[in-house]
């Protein structure tokens, strides 16, 4: 029996020709992987960074072993979920240091706390909402619980200072207005953080992206939520997929 992991096919009682073809494809794949080091690019020469999505320091350690150019999304909410109190500045700093150390001088894009709606926090309950998905989630929660965002920015700044050569980028989730962008950018820059951005996850942010980028250094398109809010369709509801 032979299993072709590339196509998902199982060959029962493979003959010599089947085995020869599979071995040749396996060698070709190994050659391509061995020659895949360096910057990512399309066949016609356009550079495309290969960046990992991570949620923990362990994710960072595992991802950094591969020939990636860094992390394009560090979901920090996993530090905050399923606990009775927010992580301390010291605990957060320790985690961020581990992540930055894992990637060395490669880029790490950190998303600040993205909670609310489907990711509630017991220690940051702002009360019931009729429609949490359109309520105080993402940056809106941080703007009401300034203590949480300030502690996180302080920890990120401390980690950045502690890891020489770290390429840290920090962005806010669920931004919809210029005013929200200005609020976050001013606050983050006050901690000395070098690259400040926002997630484009709402139609409003997409429409205002040109103006937003006069304030923010970069923007990251959150395709899941942007598609969901644009199409008014819950991405978790199979009937609407």
Identify the function of each model-found stretch.
Residues 1-20:
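Conserved glycine-bearing catalytic or ligand-binding loops at nucleotide- and phosphate-handling centers
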Residues 29-241:
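Conserved alpha/beta-domain cores
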């Amino acid at each position: 029996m032979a299993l072709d992991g590339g196509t998902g096919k199982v060959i029962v009682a493979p003959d010599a020709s089947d085995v020869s073809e599979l071995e040749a494809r396996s060698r070709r794949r190994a050659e391509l992987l061995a020659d895949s080091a360096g910057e990512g690019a399309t066949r016609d020469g356009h550079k495309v960074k290969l960046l990992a999505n991570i949620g923990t320091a362990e994710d960072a350690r595992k991802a950094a072993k591969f020939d990636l150019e860094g992390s394009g999304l560090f979901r920090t909410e996993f530090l905050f979920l399923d606990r009775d109190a927010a992580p301390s500045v010291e605990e957060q700093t320790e985690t961020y240091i581990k992540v930055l150390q894992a990637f060395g001088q490669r880029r790490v894009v950190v998303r600040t706390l993205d909670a609310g709606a489907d990711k509630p926090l017991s220690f940051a309950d702002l009360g019931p909402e009729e429609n949490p998905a359109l309520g105080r989630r993402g940056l809106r929660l941080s703007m009401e619980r300034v203590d949480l965002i300030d502690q996180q920015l302080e920890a990120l700044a401390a980690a950045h200072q502690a890891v020489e050569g770290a390429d840290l980028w920090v962005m806010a989730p669920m931004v919809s207005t210029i005013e929200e962008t200005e609020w976050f950018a001013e606050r983050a820059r006050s901690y000395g953080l070098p690259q400040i951005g926002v997630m484009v996850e709402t139609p409003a942010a997409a429409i205002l992206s040109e103006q937003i980028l006069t304030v923010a250094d970069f923007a990251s398109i959150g395709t899941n939520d942007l598609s969901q809010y644009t199409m008014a369709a819950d991405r978790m509801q199979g009937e609407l997929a």
